[in-house]
């Protein structure tokens, strides 16, 4: 599959002791191939019962192309948790902590009882996913499904243990000696 092929051949960079992979789905560079985006969206659609979904939720930034594509295919609207405050009525701020940053995310556009699908590009530490889940719970949404395209590290396990929600992923990987390894 194209996702796995492009991951195996993507560049990596080392910052300190951590090796990052640079890929169109996770970084938007060097270029996002529409065939890759279609493949990922189609694979997510096969994993989720969209009949029971009112809204798709992601955090900015790299979840945005994913939820846009999914929305176009399924006619389900999407909501983006933003990194800046808009001060809209009912806006829910939530703390986000990842392996490389700390900050706030802000949720708008979710109403009590909304049945939601959470989609994100990568789950590694689990910090972003925990923030999304916490915000949706505060809003009174019903989390029906969670899909992350790429799994790396222990984040999936951490989120599942802390929240009780199961997370589906399309591919699990690690970076070893400057190369992406599909697990």
Swiss-Prot record:
Its UniProt pathway annotation is: Purine metabolism; IMP biosynthesis via salvage pathway; IMP from hypoxanthine: step 1/1
| Localization per Swiss-Prot or TrEMBL | Cytoplasm
Catalysed conversion reaction: IMP + diphosphate = hypoxanthine + 5-phospho-alpha-D-ribose 1-diphosphate; GMP + diphosphate = guanine + 5-phospho-alpha-D-ribose 1-diphosphate
The chain's disulfide connectivity reads none
Q: Which molecular-function annotation in GO is an example for this chain? A: hypoxanthine phosphoribosyltransferase activity
A GO cellular component annotation here is: cytoplasm
Q: Does the keyword Manganese apply?
A: no
Chief place where the protein resides: cytoplasm
Swiss-Prot/TrEMBL keywords:
Cytoplasm, Glycosyltransferase, Purine salvage, Transferase
Q: Which InterPro entries match?
A: HGPRTase-like, PRibTrfase_dom, PRTase-like, Pur/Pyrimidine_PRTase
**What EC number(s) has UniProt assigned to this enzyme?**
2.4.2.8
Q: Which domain of life is it from?
A: Archaea
Q: Which Pfam families match?
A: Pribosyltran
Q: Does the keyword Glycosyltransferase apply?
A: yes
Q: Which GO terms describe its biological process?
A: IMP salvage; purine ribonucleoside salvage
User: Which family, according to UniProt?
Assistant: Belongs to the purine/pyrimidine phosphoribosyltransferase family. Archaeal HPRT subfamily.
Could you give the subunit structure recorded for this chain? Homodimer.
Name of the protein this chain belongs to: Hypoxanthine/guanine phosphoribosyltransferase
Traced from the root, the source organism's taxonomic lineage reads:
Archaea, Methanobacteriati, Methanobacteriota, Methanomada group, Methanococci
Q: Which gene encodes it?
A: hpt
């Amino acid at each position: 599959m194209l996702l796995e092929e492009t991951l195996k051949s993507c560049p990596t960079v080392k910052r300190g002791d951590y090796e990052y992979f640079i890929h169109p789905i996770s970084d938007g560079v060097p270029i996002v191939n529409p065939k890759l985006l279609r493949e990922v969206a189609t694979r997510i659609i096969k994993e989720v019962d969209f009949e029971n979904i009112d809204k798709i939720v992601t955090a900015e930034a790299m979840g945005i192309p994913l939820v846009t594509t999914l929305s176009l295919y399924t006619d389900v609207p999407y909501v983006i948790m933003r990194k800046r405050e808009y001060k809209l009525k009912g806006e829910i701020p939530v703390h986000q902590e990842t392996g490389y940053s700390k900050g706030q995310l802000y949720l708008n556009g979710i109403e009590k009882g909304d049945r939601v699908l959470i989609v994100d590009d990568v789950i590694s530490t689990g910090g972003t996913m925990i923030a999304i889940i916490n915000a949706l719970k505060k809003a009174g949404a019903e989390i029906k499904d969670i899909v992350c395209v790429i799994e790396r590290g222990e984040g999936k396990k951490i989120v599942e243990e802390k929240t009780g929600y199961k997370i589906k992923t399309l591919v699990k990987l690690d970076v070893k000696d400057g190369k992406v390894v599909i697990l």
